[in-house]
Amino acid sequence: NSEGADTFTFTIAIPSDEVLAEITGRTYDATKKMYIESERVTKYFAVGYILGEKGEGEDERYVWRYKGTFNIPDETSATENDGTDTNNMSLEYTGIYTDHIFTNGAGTGKAGSAKAAFIRESSDIATAEQWFSEVSTPDTTFD
């Protein structure tokens, strides 16, 4: 497939050093309580999220991206003050097609790999709890 990777940016609260090392393929030495910018180990993750704002009149989409890596993030920092500044991190996720061939990856009854899938809340196919209880794929069915 000649289609390229998809890149998405998530703005998140700054994770623990252990989690940051895990998702970026770096090292966290628990004995020394030290994050180490070691050589990266490529690790793939599925990521699920809700797109759209219910209160904004948008039809929320429940999304799963099946295979991707997190890039080393940009961090924002503020000097110490008495204000209410928040510090977040922009984490870039690059999604690619799965190696796995889903039975319904190219539609019902058509095998294929997939990068992602989503359903709209209004479709009544599944609740958010059902959709996110495990990674929902083109082969997932809901009761």
Question: Where is each model-derived feature located?
Answer:
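Oligomerization/assembly interface segments of phage tail-like spikes and tubes
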Residues: 1-20, 85-98
